[in-house]
From Swiss-Prot:
It comes from Ateles belzebuth (White-bellied spider monkey). InterPro entries: Glyco_trans_11 (IPR002516). The chain crosses the membrane at residues 9-25. GO terms for biological process: carbohydrate metabolic process; fucosylation; lipid metabolic process; olfactory bulb development; positive regulation of cell-matrix adhesion; positive regulation of endothelial cell migration; positive regulation of endothelial cell-matrix adhesion via fibronectin; positive regulation of sprouting angiogenesis. This is Galactoside alpha-(1,2)-fucosyltransferase 1. The gene is FUT1. GO terms for molecular function: alpha-(1,2)-fucosyltransferase activity; galactoside 2-alpha-L-fucosyltransferase activity. It is a single-pass type II membrane protein. Keywords: Glycoprotein, Glycosyltransferase, Golgi apparatus, Lipid metabolism, Membrane, Signal-anchor, Transferase, Transmembrane, Transmembrane helix. Catalyzes the transfer of L-fucose, from a guanosine diphosphate-beta-L-fucose, to the terminal galactose residue of glycoconjugates through an alpha(1,2) linkage leading to H antigen synthesis that is an intermediate substrate in the synthesis of ABO blood group antigens. H antigen is essential for maturation of the glomerular layer of the main olfactory bulb, in cell migration and early cell-cell contacts during tumor associated angiogenesis. Preferentially fucosylates soluble lactose and to a lesser extent fucosylates glycolipids gangliosides GA1 and GM1a.
Length: 366
């Protein structure tokens, strides 16, 4: 055999290097796609916009309780189709939207909303979940699951690829780990936010004429609850004594607050809320068919006083700050407590003031 020349040895070495590089690239390429990553991950293009619902964390991934998920993945990691039946009023559908988004991400599924929910929420918020076409809805082999109003362990491991949720979930235990993402989904459209801020900028304290330093949104739920709570649930709504105590709580802790009152019973509020101190403004229009003006006003305040109901919950959740709520508003034997857990409904840092249940005891007397 003829000995190899120096030139031949160099060429052979270069060939081995080229083949090794090609083999290494192919290995990385195949391994990346085996784990669900596309070329956009290997060579990220900042012009590509990934839908928020694509964020999904594997079980056990640590998550900050007040930020969005820290571990976004490519949308290809999601599969199936999940939606939720839109039911109830404005606050109910906000709870359904947030719960669908959170559970779908937790289970690695794609979330879609139905047209009725889009109609209710899209005029108010910059929601991003896509809408499921009616013809797709009717042809999809759904499994249906009715949720109760608190997060349960089984909801973290739902294997159904085509799932239609229902119920009235409105508990922070479903979605609080995604708080910033939820707040982003429920960002007001500019014209609503600006209109609410214009209203607040015009407010002055009655006695001094000074500008308020603290805005406290007050939502007083009345309407159908006046009958539903005592007759069906052995419960009460917030009365004037509760509202006075809640306002005094803020007066003792915040300088120069103004209380911005909204309600679906504004006439009752004007007659029963003491405005003699000059720090109460009856700002709500009370229009139940178009609640977004009142809602926008509440979310632009610094703090919240709520009575009962999902409308007040969401106003407080989005406003941030301090929240005072009506606590223990049913009798201990109320059937309502089978579907409602106070510890799952109100954030731990919120402040509860016990309701006056004496009207219920009077009704119970023979």
């Amino acid at each position: 055999m003829w000995p190899l020349s120096h030139r031949h040895l160099c060429l052979a070495f270069l060939l081995v290097c080229v083949l090794s590089a090609i083999s290494f690239f192919l290995h990385i390429h195949q391994d990346s796609f085996r784990h669900g990553l596309g070329l956009s991950v290997l060579c990220p293009d900042r012009r590509l916009v990934t839908h928020p619902v694509a964020i999904f964390c594997l079980p056990g991934t640590p998550m900050s309780p007040n930020t969005s998920s820290p571990c976004p993945q490519h949308p290809a990691s999601l599969s199936g189709t999940w939606t939720i039946y839109p039911d109830g009023r404005f606050g109910n559908q906000m709870g359904q939207y947030a719960t669908l988004l959170a559970l779908a991400q937790l289970n690695g599924r794609r979330a879609f909303i139905l047209p009725a929910m889009h109609t209710a929420l899209a005029p108010v918020f910059r929601i991003t979940l896509p809408v499921l076409a009616p013809e797709v809805d009717s042809l999809t082999p759904w499994r249906e699951l009715r949720l109760h109003d608190w997060m349960s362990e089984e909801y973290a491991d739902l294997g159904d690829p085509f799932l239609k949720l229902s119920g009235f979930p409105c508990s922070w235990t479903f979605f609080h780990h995604l708080r910033e993402q939820i707040r982003s989904e429920f960002t007001l459209h500019d014209h609503l936010r600006e209109e609410a801020q214009r209203v607040l900028r015009r407010l002055h304290l009655g006695r001094s004429g000074d500008r308020p330093r603290t805005f406290v949104g007050v939502h007083v739920r009345r309407g159908d609850y006046l009958q539903v709570m005592p007759q069906r649930w052995k419960g009460v709504v917030g009365n004037s004594a509760y509202l006075r105590e809640a306002m005094d709580w803020f007066r003792a802790r915040h300088e120069a607050p103004v209380f911005v009152v909204t309600s679906n019973g504004m006439e009752w509020c004007r007659e029963n809320i003491d405005a003699s101190k000059g720090d109460v403004v009856f700002a709500g229009d009370g229009q139940e068919a178009s609640p977004w003006k009142d809602f926008a006003l509440l979310t632009q305040c610094n703090h919240t006083i709520m009575t009962i109901g999902t409308f007040g919950f969401w106003a407080a959740y989005l406003a941030g700050g301090d929240t005072v709520y009506l606590a223990n508003f049913t009798l201990p034997d109320s059937e309502f407590l089978k579907i409602f857990k106070p510890e799952a409904a109100f954030l731990p840092e919120w402040v509860g003031i016990n309701a006056d249940l004496s009207p219920l005891w009077t009704l119970a007397e023979p």
